Amino acid sequence: MSHPQFAAELLQRAEKQGPITIGLAGAGQMGTDIVVQVALMPGMRIGAISEVRPQAAIDAALLAGHDRSDIVQAPNAPAIDRAIEGGKIAVTEDLHALAAAGRIDVIIDATGNPNVGTLFALEVMKNGKHIVMLNVEADITIGRFLKEEARKAGVVYTGAAGDEPACTLEIIGFARSLGFNIVAAGKGKNNPLKFDAVPADYEKEAAERNMNARMLVDFF
């Protein structure tokens, strides 16, 4: 699907059924980027954010331009639904509540934790919701299994457009459309190569980039 077509279909969907309501798990660097970008997109809205650090979720929504009065704490699924019905953004510390909330159409996992992401994805599927995996750590480990579980549940399991795997596939598709034979595909390294990097040495840089130090070091 082309980007212009996608934009048009989002508008059509919003006119007929209202915007797609997103539940976001995680408000770190990637999660915050999602909140900010969705605020600019017609046809989508962030309905709820689950984050073990609630202030991080609040800060992400404020950065996206939402008023503080439009951000409410929601301890359980019914509270999340009430917030969404009232046009608010719900902030919860409970991933289970996010998975169970009835007013959410699709979940984005931006936790970056493979164990949490896997268990959460399975719970999301059991609740009949589609899941976008912005958790490459989980996807690369057990994504094939999760894809099959989604098929059994009748929901969609997919990667995130804009993340590196999806961008690589877009480039492959473009090259094939030009008649090229693809023999290899991947990405170049855009971080320093440091074999001895440990999280404790990068706490300050990670905080400045709104990242987990362990994850930052993983890229080195």
Regions found by a protein language model. Name each.
Residues M1-E123:
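N-terminal glycine-/serine-/threonine-rich beta1-alpha1-beta2 phosphate-ribose binding loop
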Residues A27, E51-V52, H96, G112-N113, ...:
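Short, ordered loop/turn segments at secondary-structure junctions
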Residues V35-V36, I58, L122, R144-E148, ...:
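Predominant activation on well-ordered alpha-helical scaffold segments within soluble catalytic domains
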Residues A39-G43, Q55, L62, H66, ...:
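Generic secondary-structure signature for well-ordered alpha-helical cores
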Residues V91-E93, I108-D109, M133-L134, Y157-A160, ...:
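General beta-strand structural signal in soluble alpha/beta enzymes
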Residues R103, N127-H130:
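Glycine-enriched alpha-helix->loop->beta-strand junction motifs that scaffold or abut catalytic
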Residues T111-N127, N135-V156, A160-D163:
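Rossmann-fold NAD(P)-binding glycine/threonine-rich loop
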Residues R144, R151-F220:
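Core active-site phosphate/anionic-ligand binding loop and the adjoining beta-turn-alpha structural block
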